[in-house]
């Protein structure tokens, strides 16, 4: 969705904390005070910088084999989360340099789980994304190393992906996940040749929304929270306590700037794409990665043609088959990689973002903290009180890796009040939600040949409730969603999870 050139960003002249409800962005807890972390702008920035530094891990190269920071969630869910984020939010107007009013921001994506990041404006308006039949997506050049039918995304002469949302080419993994959605759509067309394009779209969206409700949320959010939003086993709109809208759902900043930034803690230092040793790559090529022994000379950055040998072997990202968890060196190269645990640590590379990705600041944890402060988010403790939840004590808000056994070489885990006195009973909402997850752990049986369980933190009563209510609200507020059109609908295969979606796209 593009902004008309003659119009400024909606509400850009509004005073902070506007009472309007109908912007694309807004607040869940409008009466709560903004959290401050200093008396001056410099003090706020300095204190948040200190916290961001404590949340940033030391350099750790991507390797094969099991990893103590892994959760029981296969790695592809991290990038499904990124894909979903691109489906519902795009805010090019908010700033890290000045205070922002959420009511003044425009979401340039529809705040709905409608796959507009896949379909764009449709074949009539964006025919260059589709084949001549006007129903199926164009696919790109062939990739090797993984799935034999793998292709890159279609690209312009400048190697830019011709897709519904260019952000889905940000890295090699989300780029190839976008390609799977294209192939899922194309196979749905082939299996239903008489259905018109609109009905094909609906069928694909239903599978996507069903997977989100019955798989994605279940893995990330504590089960008791999800059950509390149901009546007789079915999600009910009347169960939403905190997310309310007048005409159309908006995008709450407590979700987009805090709760749904959980995925940043799930990112690994790098990933292996397939058997080729050149495809064990860091997410970003930092100076430390270049100096590693052996050194890395490339990374998983996107916005370029995917190398021909970089087709993803999807069994390394999702359990489309069953592999050995921890075996010989050769077996470890083929193992299923798992997302890192939801905790208050972020891998080193995300604190050293390349200039092409972000700058001023280049550290993702600091960018998140500054954005929350600039948008006037309340503290985690204030939000907990407003939700009727007993807040975590400062001693419970731990900063560092949420592993079972600390590595002596890692910085010690410390409580938030030891970072700076300004954070006593005043934790930034994003950090609070991550810390809360460290107290809501499940032992997850992972889909491998051995019998293995892994400690897996999940979003708790503050972060999980915000995330669940917003996802459900976006679906209840969309007249064309699964929950409104056919809430009893189920896929042909049940239970239906991300691996089933991937297998269908792969032609299995």
Functional labels for PLM-detected ranges:
Residues 1-167, 171-172, 190-508:
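Terminal regions of secretory-pathway proteins
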């Amino acid at each position: 969705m593009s902004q008309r050139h003659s119009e400024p960003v909606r509400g850009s002249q509004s005073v902070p904390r506007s009472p309007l409800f109908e912007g694309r962005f807004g607040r869940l807890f409008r009466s709560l005070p903004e959290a401050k972390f200093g008396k001056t702008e410099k003090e706020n920035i300095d204190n948040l910088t200190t916290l961001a530094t404590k949340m940033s891990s030391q350099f750790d190269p991507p390797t094969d084999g099991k990893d103590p920071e892994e959760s029981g969630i296969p790695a592809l869910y991290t990038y499904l989360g990124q894909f979903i984020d691109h489906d519902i939010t795009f805010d090019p107007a908010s700033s890290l340099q000045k205070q922002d009013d959420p009511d003044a921001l425009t979401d340039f994506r529809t705040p709905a789980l409608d796959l507009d990041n896949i379909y764009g404006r449709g074949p009539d308006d964006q025919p260059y994304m589709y084949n001549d039949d006007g129903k199926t997506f164009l696919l790109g050049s062939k990739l090797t190393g993984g799935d034999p039918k793998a292709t890159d995304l279609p690209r312009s002469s400048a190697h830019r992906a011709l897709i519904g949302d260019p952000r889905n080419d940000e890295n090699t993994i989300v780029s190839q996940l976008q390609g799977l959605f294209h192939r899922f759509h194309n196979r749905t067309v082939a299996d239903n040749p008489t259905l018109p394009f609109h009905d094909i779209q609906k069928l694909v969206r239903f599978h996507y929304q069903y997977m989100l409700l019955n798989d994605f949320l279940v893995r990330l959010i504590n089960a008791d929270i999800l059950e509390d939003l149901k009546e007789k086993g079915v999600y009910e709109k009347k169960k939403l306590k905190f997310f309310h809208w007048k005409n159309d759902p908006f995008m709450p900043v407590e979700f987009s700037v805090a709760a749904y930034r959980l995925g940043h803690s799930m990112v690994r230092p790098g990933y292996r794409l397939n058997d080729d040793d050149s495809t064990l790559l860091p997410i970003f090529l930092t100076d430390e990665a270049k100096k590693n022994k052996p050194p890395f000379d490339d990374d998983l950055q996107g916005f370029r043609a995917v190398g021909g040998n970089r087709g993803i072997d999807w069994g390394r990202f999702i359990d489309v088959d069953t592999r050995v968890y921890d075996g010989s060196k050769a077996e470890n190269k083929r193992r299923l990689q798992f997302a890192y645990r939801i905790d208050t640590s972020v891998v080193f590379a995300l604190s050293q973002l390349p200039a092409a990705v972000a700058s001023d600041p280049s550290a993702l944890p600091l960018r998140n903290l500054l954005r929350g402060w600039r948008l006037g988010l309340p503290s985690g403790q204030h939000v907990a009180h407003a939700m009727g939840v007993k807040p975590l004590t400062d001693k419970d808000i731990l900063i560092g890796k949420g592993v079972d056994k600390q590595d002596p070489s890692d910085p010690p885990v410390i409580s938030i009040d030891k970072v700076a006195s300004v954070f006593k009973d005043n934790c930034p909402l994003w950090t609070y939600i991550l810390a809360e997850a460290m107290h809501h752990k499940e032992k997850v049986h992972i889909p491998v040949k051995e019998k293995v369980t892994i400690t897996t933190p999940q979003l708790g009563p503050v972060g999980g409730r915000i995330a669940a209510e917003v996802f459900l609200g976006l679906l209840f507020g969309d007249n064309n969603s699964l929950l409104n059109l056919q809430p009893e609908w189920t896929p042909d295969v049940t239970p239906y999870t991300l691996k089933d979606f991937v297998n269908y796209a792969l032609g299995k």
